[in-house]
């Protein structure tokens, strides 16, 4: 059987395994991960604590080269960090002594741009994330959501092929998280770059992703991949969305709970849900 050729900007992860040393013995963190991400695709990776999803993101970013298997971006093996792979973490990691603009500008230190081009790129990305008027604000003067917008702008300012997002909204309140999910979707539609989001929030994964990769823990492995063939913008109250959410949650159900929560409803309807169930109820335990 022949393997399909890798297209431009495609991410190809083949038989990747990762171990850490624990008390002198190897601890398996990832086991035989194989995944191909298409150019411009938004892929969500969801799983509970210990499934290795953040470790996988670090490997793709080039922050850790100690693993078995291969990771290629646009046909080139990932050996180190690169301006072509931006990353955003759960904590914004802004320099507290720099303003919003200066934090974004700092990411351009190694970019082959003139000073004028760098200033223009910073201004463009300040506008892209909706922070006009806050260019000179310091991190302590920004809300958590605004600080994450700066972090996203910093991750995008080098115009990477891929943006990696490691639970970027996990520390935010539900309302701010919802707003930034919409903002991230708008940015993705505008930029049309590949995005890989790691999250433990099933709703977030389905709301944003073209595909959702579910991971099982210890060692981390891909449980299955779900295509999210729903139009954008998506509605969480859409019966199709709810069915997909239930299907994904079934992968994480504890024995004895799944049958009670997923009993077949009468007349082929949807399983009953408590009224006004908050989105946070569908976030997996850390």
Identify the residue ranges that each predicted region occupies.
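Conserved ABC ATPase "signature" region
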Residues: 116-134, 186
């Amino acid at each position: 059987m022949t393997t399909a050729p890798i297209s431009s900007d495609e991410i190809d992860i083949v038989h990747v395994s990762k171990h850490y040393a624990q008390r002198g013995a190897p601890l398996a963190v990832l086991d035989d991960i194989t995944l191909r991400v298409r150019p411009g695709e938004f892929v969500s990776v969801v799983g509970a604590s210990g499934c290795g999803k953040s470790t996988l993101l670090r490997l793709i970013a080039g922050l850790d080269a100690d693993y078995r298997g291969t990771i290629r971006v646009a046909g080139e093996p990932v050996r180190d960090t690169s301006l072509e792979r931006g990353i955003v973490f759960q904590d914004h990691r802004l320099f507290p002594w720099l303003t919003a603009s200066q934090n974004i500008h700092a990411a351009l230190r190694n970019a082959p741009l003139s000073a004028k081009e760098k200033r223009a790129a910073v201004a463009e990305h300040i506008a892209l994330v909706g922070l006009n008027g806050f260019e000179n604000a310091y991190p302590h003067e920004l809300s958590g959501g605004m600080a994450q917008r700066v972090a996203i702008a910093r991750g995008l300012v080098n115009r990477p092929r891929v943006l990696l997002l490691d639970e970027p909204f996990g520390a935010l309140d539900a309302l701010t998280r919802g707003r930034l999910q919409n903002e991230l979707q708008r940015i993705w539609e505008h930029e049309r770059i590949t995005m890989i989001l790691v999250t433990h929030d099933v709703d977030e994964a389905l709301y944003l992703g073209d595909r959702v990769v579910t991971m099982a823990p210890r060692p981390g492995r891909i449980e299955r991949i779900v295509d999210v063939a729903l139009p954008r913008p998506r509605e969480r109250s859409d019966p199709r969305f709810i069915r997909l959410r239930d299907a994904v949650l079934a992968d994480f159900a504890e024995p004895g709970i799944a049958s009670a929560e997923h009993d077949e409803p009468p007349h082929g309807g949807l399983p009953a849900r408590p009224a006004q169930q908050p989105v946070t109820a569908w976030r997996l335990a850390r």
